[in-house]
Design a protein with these regions (language model features):
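Active-site-surrounding "flap" and adjacent substrate/cofactor-binding loops of secreted or lumenal enzymes
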Residues: 5-8, 19-26, 30-93
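Intrinsically disordered, low-complexity linker/terminal regions across diverse proteins
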Residues: 2-5, 235-239, 259, 263, ...
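Noncatalytic, helix-rich "gating/capping" subdomain that lines the substrate-entry/channel surface
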Residues: 67-357, 361
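Short, solvent-exposed loop/turn and secondary-structure capping segments
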Residues: 38-42, 137, 161-163, 211-213, ...
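Hydrophobic/aromatic-rich, well-ordered segments within soluble, folded domains that form packed cores
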Residues: 16-37, 164-186, 552, 558-564
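Short secondary-structure subsegments characteristic of cysteine-rich extracellular domains
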Residues: 43-66, 193-210, 481-487, 582, ...
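Extracellular/periplasmic catalytic domains that process cell-envelope and extracellular macromolecules
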Residues: 19-23, 142-144, 453-456, 583-585
Length: 656
């Protein structure tokens, strides 16, 4: 039986509002200020807010599914769920095992005597879910988006990003990281853990120096380097890539052509793969193994890992309960099995119908907006409209569910189950290489509170779990839904026309469909938006700024999303003027709903980490900086030059 939105859930929760803050000065804190004042971040979380609360609800729903699933025959999907969860929840068995599960793989690392053996071992580790030196996935070929091709990219780091290894601002984190590495290796039985940790940090610093930075990796053209395997191997002498493939369980023939996303990384890392560095590489491999396995080992390992990744990096003081971590494991390994039941219990057909209408109106709003753009030539408009017409939309859940029949889950074998689940997913990915694209595949489960745009498939996807308040409320007025899920839809469509998506055509092919003049006009507008965000500093971290170049794609998505949602709401009204509700006009309610979506309270440590690594701007700016660029917001609330949110008209950015 599907569940619909509770009719008692308010469309706008006025108890969250802070009327001491004028909407014209700070929309975000006007709508969320009272909520922020009374809300404490749970001790097992780095943040709380609209997204987190929905994720908590989804987590509880998944736990209910896992713990109430009817036992099935051995090997059935139901039994796999039960056995995997039980293997994690048997804390006594995990504690009794201690560090013993690490003994055999650590001995294999210690026995490595050549670079070739090392690279083969790293390949095997990658296959089994251990952090590796390279990332690998099968994805649409940007030059021929009807087929899958193998992508390989940079990896090998235990810190969040390459800049953590080089910038003075992260010196304290580097010290804490070294202490964590030493502590983990000591738990694993290393008597020289301090020296091993020094070797790990030194080697990872060298690996980080080979990495492309975050902004450079946003350039899809620079990242698309299709080449035969032989050419790739010739470009990175000293890197026995075929040995790594063999470790993965993949032949050179199966790899065929591949896309090398950061070619210089492989060339430079090959220079680090020398016999004299083997001791350091063994230390790094041991650390990667221990770190990756720690969440599934005895509590001393779990707490050691959480102390750094949870507390130092994110500020979270307390590890979340074991059942929540068990749910995470099942979600990662058997997500679509759980998703089938989640949809049956929690997805309303009414939501699907209203979403279809919302999407249709957002598409029409984009069509009208593109047609009326003054800065774009008719030639490029025609191609933009062609791309818009080819958008594919997926709502709620997949029409074809993933087949887990070959995934073996063994009762009581937690680490084995983790390794087999990772290997199953890797082999499923590798098997796609060279095959036609599966257009029905989803890259998120229905119980995921998120949405995405895929530039190489030109599709927007909205899982069932995001179709809940404050994003979507089937009992709410249109204005609230257009300011919430409507802007999310517009945001995802907008990614098709952001700095990355605009380099792909309607078929997902990496191809320039712009005139030079139009591309220049587009980039002039995006430069202004980059500069706006570069100037912003969160209240919590005034010593740090938003990286406008890193966040430009999401900022374009937000700006287009809200602007087009506003237009789509007008289309939906068909000339009618909606009545005011709770003292607010429909125009005002749309913008108030937009602000409610970004309701967030985060720990300082997490804010700092996200400013350094996240392509999304902080919530307060996703709300406030966007409305400063939207003329309709000024009209809705009579914003004037003396108000804090005022932005001079010639400084406002309008792209789509």
């Amino acid at each position: 039986m599907t569940q619909t939105t509770d009719e008692t859930v308010p469309a706008l929760d006025l108890s969250d509002f802070d009327d001491t803050v004028r909407v014209q000065d700070d929309l975000y804190r006007h709508v969320n200020g009272a909520w922020a004042e009374r809300t404490e971040i749970p001790e097992d979380k780095p943040m709380v807010g609209a997204f987190v609360e929905l994720r908590d609800a989804a987590e509880a729903a998944v736990r209910d599914i896992i713990t109430t699933v009817e036992p099935g025959a051995p090997g059935s999907e139901a039994q796999k769920i039960a056995d995997l969860y039980a293997s994690f929840m048997d804390a006594d068995a995990v504690e009794a095992a201690g560090a013993t599960p690490l003994a055999e793989p650590l001995a294999a690392i210690a026995a490595v005597g050549t670079v070739d053996e090392l690279v083969g071992l790293v390949g095997r580790h990658t296959r089994q879910g251990v952090r590796g030196l390279f990332d690998i996935e099968a994805e649409s070929d940007p030059g021929n988006p009807d087929r899958y091709v193998m992508f390989v990219g940079q990896g090998g780091l235990g810190l969040p990003d390459e800049e953590y290894y080089r910038l003075p601002a992260y010196a304290d984190i580097r010290t804490a990281y070294r202490t964590h590495v030493a502590g983990s290796l000591a738990l694993a039985g290393f008597s020289d853990a301090e020296a091993q940790a020094d070797a790990v940090l030194e080697l990872e610093t060298a690996i980080a120096a080979c990495h492309w930075d975050k902004v450079r990796t946003r350039d899809l053209r620079a990242m698309y380097n299709l080449m035969p395997l032989a050419d790739f191997e010739a470009s990175a002498p000293g890197l026995p890539f075929a040995t790594w493939l063999a470790g993965l369980g993949m032949s050179e023939e199966a790899a065929g052509e591949l896309v090398v996303t950061q070619p210089s990384f492989f060339t430079d890392v090959a220079g680090l793969l020398t016999e004299d560095r083997l001791p350091a590489w063994r230390s790094w491999a041991a650390w990667s193994l221990v770190s990756s396995r720690s969440p599934y080992l005895a509590s001393a390992f779990v707490q050691e890992r959480f102390g750094f990744y949870g507390t130092v990096l994110s500020g979270t003081p307390v590890l979340k309960e074991r059942w929540k971590r068990g749910v995470d494991l099942v979600e990662g390994a058997l997500g679509e099995v759980v998703g089938k039941v989640y949809v049956e219990r929690h997805f309303s057909p009414v939501a699907k119908d209203r979403m279809d209408t919302l999407v249709a109106n957002l598409i029409e709003a984009y069509r009208r907006s593109i047609s009326d753009l003054a800065w774009m030539t008719e030639e490029t408009k025609a191609r933009a409209l062609d791309k818009l017409g080819k958008f594919r939309t997926k709502i709620g859940f997949p029409t074809q569910w993933r087949d887990y029949s070959t995934l073996e889950i063994v009762p009581g074998d937690l680490l084995g189950n983790v390794a087999r689940a990772t290997e199953f997913e890797l082999q499923r990915s590798i098997a796609k290489i060279g095959a036609p694209i599966d257009r029905e595949e989803w890259l998120m489960t229905p119980q995921t509170v998120n949405a995405y745009y895929h530039p190489l498939r030109n599709e927007i996807v909205f899982p069932a779990a995001i179709l809940q308040p404050p994003f979507f409320n089937e009992h709410a007025d249109d204005a609230v839904n257009y300011g919430g899920i409507g802007a999310v839809i517009g945001h995802e469509i907008g990614h098709g026309f952001d700095d990355q998506g605009s380099t792909c055509d309607g078929d997902g092919r990496l191809q320039n469909w712009w005139t030079d003049a139009d591309r220049e006009a587009f980039e002039e507008r995006t430069k202004v938006l980059v500069a706006q965000y570069d100037a912003l500093s969160p209240v919590q971290t005034p010593d740090m700024h938003v990286n406008g170049s890193l966040t430009i794609g999401e900022n374009i998505g937000d700006l287009g999303g809200l602007s087009i949602a506003h237009l789509a709401h007008h289309i939906a009204q068909e000339g009618r003027e909606p009545e005011a509700i709770e003292g607010f006009t429909a125009e005002q309610r749309l913008f108030l709903s937009w602000a409610a979506v970004w309701q967030t309270k985060a720990r300082d440590e997490l804010v700092r980490q996200r400013l350094a690594t996240d392509p999304h701007s902080p919530a307060e700016f996703r709300c406030n900086q966007i409305v400063r660029n939207v003329d309709a917001f000024y009209a809705a609330f009579d914003v004037r030059a003396s108000d804090e949110l005022w932005l001079e008209e010639d400084q406002r950015v309008s792209i789509w």
